[in-house]
């Protein structure tokens, strides 16, 4: 489960700059700004897909549409044969800023993912299992403000996975984290993906994150945003561009495509 098909997707917003752009500009649709134009995009079951692209190109908008938060679109998103008409527990969204409820403890936040489980004993066992899995044992009764940024992100990951979704959607999961914490969370996300085999979509600005994590990399670019790169990575993990020339060449290709002439 977790096959995703995007068909004839177009997304527009009211154009507050109407009259400032030239006639015939494809970005200007007579009072609307054309943001996304994706005729066909497919994510296979159990893939981890990393979405790359410059800031403001529509990556997060695409994730919101796939998650069912934004239905003001033309076209369809189909998950496992069903047209997405709104949010669902089958596809869980992890926001780029902490989505933990501040008045709830770690335990209570994770419990939100299994509210439908009626058996109290089974529910408690499952909550503890996932808290232990993300290395937050002994922090069950802590509130979000008592946790570091990385710990908050792990709690969000536990809450998402405990719900057993078919699709896990993550919008910039490393946002606001220091470099070492980013590396740790990245490793945990990859490990969780390999353990649970969930279709996982991750928005990132970091080419290296995409290369190290993704089974597939999709890049958006242009205005309106279109798919300008879509490739499955046939590299085993762990990956190191410094030791793999093909991976290093792909890294350079992605930097150039995103408008960076060299990698620092």
List each model region and its residues:
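The feature captures the beta-strand-to-loop junction immediately N-terminal to the Walker
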Residues: 52-54
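Conserved ABC ATPase "signature" region
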Residues: 121-139, 191
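Conserved ABC ATPase signature
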Residues: 143-147, 151
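A short, proline-enriched helix->beta-strand linker immediately N-terminal to the Walker B motif
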Residues: 162-166
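Helix-to-loop junction immediately C-terminal to a conserved catalytic motif
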Residues: 67
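Catalytic Walker B motif of ABC-type/P-loop ATPase nucleotide-binding domains
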Residues: 168-171
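Short coil-to-helix segment of the ABC ATPase nucleotide-binding domain corresponding to the Q-loop/switch region
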Residues: 104-111
């Amino acid at each position: 489960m977790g096959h995703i098909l995007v068909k004839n997707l177009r997304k527009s917003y009211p154009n507050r700059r109407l009259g400032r752009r030239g006639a015939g500009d494809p970005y200007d649709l007579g009072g609307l700004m054309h943001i996304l134009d994706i005729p066909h995009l497919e994510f296979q079951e159990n893939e981890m897909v990393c979405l790359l692209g410059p800031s403001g190109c529509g990556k997060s908008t695409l994730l919101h549409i796939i998650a069912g938060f934004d239905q003001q679109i033309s076209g369809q998103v189909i998950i496992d044969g069903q047209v997405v008409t709104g949010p669902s527990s089958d596809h869980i969204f992890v926001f780029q800023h902490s989505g933990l409820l501040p008045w709830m403890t770690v335990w209570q936040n994770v419990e939100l993912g299994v509210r439908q489980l009626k058996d109290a004993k089974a529910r408690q066992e499952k909550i503890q299992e996932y808290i232990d899995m993300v290395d937050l044992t002994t922090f069950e009764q802590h509130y979000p403000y008592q946790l570091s940024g990385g710990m908050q992100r792990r709690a969000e990951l536990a809450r998402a996975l405990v719900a057993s979704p078919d699709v896990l959607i993550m919008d910039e999961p490393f946002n606001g984290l220091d470099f070492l914490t980013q590396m740790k969370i990245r490793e945990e996300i990859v490990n969780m993906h390999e353990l649970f085999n969930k279709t996982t979509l991750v928005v990132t600005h970091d080419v290296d994150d995409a290369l190290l994590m993704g089974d597939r990399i999709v890049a958006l670019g242009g205005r309106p945003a279109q798919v300008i790169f879509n490739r499955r990575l046939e590299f085993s993990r762990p990956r190191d561009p410094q030791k793999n020339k093909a991976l290093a060449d792909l890294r350079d290709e992605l930097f150039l495509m995103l408008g960076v002439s060299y990698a620092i």
